[in-house]
C-alpha cells in the first residue's frame, strides 16, 4: 500500500486516482492522529502539494526524517520543498509566481521518475516558493530544471529512494505525469519483490 499524505490540497485526489489505478492506496491528512501508524504500514510515502511553507504542514517534515532510507518517498510541490528543508537545503520565494503555468523542463541527469521520458517535456507549475540553488543539498542530484526561468524542478537521492518534484505530475497539464507516477510505483513493487525473495 502506498500512503498519500494530504497537505490539504485540491490536487491530492488526482494523485489518489493516479496511484489507485496502479496499486493499493490510502490517504490521510498531514495532522491526523493515525498518520504515524499508517506510515509504518505503508510500502512507500507520497507527500502531496499544499499551501504555505512545509514547516507549517502538520507532521510532514517529521515523517520524512523518520522514514527516509526505510521506504521510498516522493514529494510533490510542497512535499518537494519539505524534502529540501529536511536534508539541509534552503527555500526562497520564486522570482516569478507560477500558478497554473506550463513550463518546459530539461533533464540534467538521470532520475528514476523520468524513465522512458524525453530529455525535455512540459509540466504544470503551481508555486511561489522554490529551492534555493545557491545552497547545496548533500546526497541529492538535481535532475531537472525549468528552461524558462532556470528554477530547480526535480531532485533525487537514488540510494535512499527519495524523489522530489516541484511541478505537478498529477495535473492534466503535465502530459507524462502518469508515467512518472508509474515509475515510482514500479520501484516500490520491485522493492517488495526483492524483500519477499530474501
UniProtKB/Swiss-Prot annotation:
Positions with a binding annotation for L-glutamine: 50-52, 81, 128-129
Residues spanning the membrane: none
GO molecular-function terms, A-Z: anthranilate synthase activity
Enzyme Commission numbers on file: 4.1.3.27
The entry's keywords: Amino-acid biosynthesis, Aromatic amino acid biosynthesis, Glutamine amidotransferase, Lyase, Tryptophan biosynthesis
Gene Ontology CC: one annotated term: cytosol
Signal sequence extent: none
SUPFAM superfamilies, A to Z: Class I glutamine amidotransferase-like
GO biological process, one term: L-tryptophan biosynthetic process
Pathway(s) it belongs to: Amino-acid biosynthesis; L-tryptophan biosynthesis; L-tryptophan from chorismate: step 1/5
Gene3D superfamilies per record: 3.40.50.880
Enzyme class: lyase
Reaction(s) the record says it catalyses: chorismate + L-glutamine = anthranilate + pyruvate + L-glutamate + H(+)
Catalytic residue list: 77 (nucleophile), 168 (for gatase activity), 170 (for gatase activity)
Listed InterPro entries: Anth_synth/Amidotransfase (IPR050472), Class_I_gatase-like (IPR029062), GATASE (IPR017926), TrpG/PapA_dom (IPR006221)
Domain Glutamine amidotransferase type-1: 1-194
Role this protein plays: Part of a heterotetrameric complex that catalyzes the two-step biosynthesis of anthranilate, an intermediate in the biosynthesis of L-tryptophan. In the first step, the glutamine-binding beta subunit (TrpG) of anthranilate synthase (AS) provides the glutamine amidotransferase activity which generates ammonia as a substrate that, along with chorismate, is used in the second step, catalyzed by the large alpha subunit of AS (TrpE) to produce anthranilate. In the absence of TrpG, TrpE can synthesize anthranilate directly from chorismate and high concentrations of ammonia.
Assembly mode: Heterotetramer consisting of two non-identical subunits: a beta subunit (TrpG) and a large alpha subunit (TrpE).
Protein name: Anthranilate synthase component 2
Organism: Lactococcus lactis subsp. lactis (strain IL1403)
Amino acid at each position: 500500500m502506498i500512503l498519500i499524505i494530504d497537505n490539504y490540497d485540491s490536487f491530492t485526489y488526482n494523485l489518489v486516482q493516479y496511484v489507485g489505478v496502479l496499486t493499493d492506496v490510502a490517504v490521510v491528512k498531514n495532522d491526523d492522529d493515525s498518520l504515524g501508524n499508517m506510515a509504518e504500514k505503508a510500502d512507500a510515502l507520497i507527500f502531496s502539494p499544499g499551501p504555505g511553507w512545509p514547516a507549517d504542514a502538520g507532521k510532514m517534515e517529521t515523517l520524512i526524517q523518520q522514514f527516509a532510507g526505510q521506504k521510498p518517498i516522493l514529494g510533490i510541490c510542497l512535499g518537494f520543498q519539505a524534502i529540501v528543508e529536511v536534508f539541509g537545503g534552503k527555500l526562497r520565494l520564486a522570482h516569478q509566481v507560477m500558478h497554473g503555468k506550463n513550463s518546459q523542463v530539461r533533464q540534467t541527469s538521470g532520475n528514476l521518475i523520468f524513465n522512458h521520458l524525453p530529455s525535455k517535456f512540459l509540466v504544470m507549475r503551481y508555486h511561489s516558493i522554490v529551492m534555493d540553488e545557491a545552497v547545496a543539498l548533500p546526497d541529492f542530484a538535481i535532475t531537472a530544471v525549468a528552461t524558462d526561468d532556470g528554477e530547480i524542478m526535480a531532485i533525487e537521492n537514488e540510494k535512499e529512494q527519495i524523489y522530489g518534484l516541484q511541478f505537478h505530475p498529477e495535473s492534466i497539464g503535465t502530459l507524462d505525469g502518469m508515467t512518472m507516477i508509474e515509475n515510482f510505483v514500479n520501484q516500490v513493487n520491485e522493492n517488495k519483490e526483492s524483500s519477499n525473495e530474501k
